[in-house]
A protein has these predicted regions:
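Extracellular glycan-associated modules
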Residues: 1-229
Length: 229
């Protein structure tokens, strides 16, 4: 894979909106500082869908997507728990454990998480396969939010633990303030037609990079068929 190095960050880069189509964030080493801060377009959420693709070779716990509020450090978190081999969504400081996934190292994985506050149900999709829907937490995610890639927030916007940091690559991050249909999620999984996130849009992403983070060309993927209907 031919990678075009666009940016090596040694400090904080000012926020900007950029089309990252065909690009990825690379987190090349284990730190408790390097991360990407994403700036969402709204504050209060009665429903959420978050999708992202990532690849890593680390054999330990790590966070992929971390949203915190002043009162809830795990407002919306996607976390891999290595000891039990579980993907753990955390919402409003509650947690559900999903085991049985073939979460291979050195392999790209597409993950989507959906949740709505009315029913309090969460569901994850991993590489096109859905989990069961389980109760996690009802009630809205309210107030100011901070969203981070590459670290897990133990405090609002900080409290990073090097042993929970992400090492690898992340791409195609989208966030919606509603639950995507199963067909829309399958289209995301296959990298086909997709309505981009209305909260976070990879094609017009407002972000800041902090520490040792690279922006590189992502590998060419082989598209699957479009889900219609």
């Amino acid at each position: 894979m031919k990678l075009l190095l666009l940016l090596v960050v040694l400090g904080t880069v000012s926020a900007r909106v950029q089309d990252l189509s065909g690009k990825m964030f690379t987190f090349p080493k284990q730190t408790n500082t390097a991360h990407v801060k994403l700036n969402p377009t709204k504050l209060d959420y009665n429903a959420v869908t978050v999708c992202h693709r990532s690849v890593t070779d680390i054999k330990r716990d790590h966070a992929i997507f971390s949203l915190a509020t002043p009162s809830q450090n795990n407002g919306f978190l996607t976390f891999w728990q290595n000891g039990n081999q579980e993907i753990q969504p955390h919402i409003r400081n509650a947690r559900v454990e999903y085991g049985g996934w073939d979460y291979k190292l050195n392999t790209w994985h597409s993950i989507c998480t959906t949740w709505d506050s009315e029913k309090g149900l969460v569901q994850i999709w991993v590489d096109g396969m859905p989990s069961i829907r389980r109760y996690i937490s009802s009630g809205a995610i309210s107030g100011a939010v901070k969203i981070v890639l590459g670290q897990e927030q133990d405090t609002f916007g900080g409290g990073f633990d090097i042993n929970q940091s992400f090492v690898g690559m992340i791409t195609d991050v989208h966030m919606w303030d509603y639950t995507l249909s199963s067909c829309e999620i399958q289209n995301y999984m296959g990298e086909m037609n997709l309505t981009p996130g209305n909260v976070l849009n990879w094609r017009a992403l407002d972000f800041e990079t902090i520490g040792s983070v690279l922006i590189e060309d992502k590998p060419v993927c082989h598209p699957a068929s479009i889900c219609v209907g």
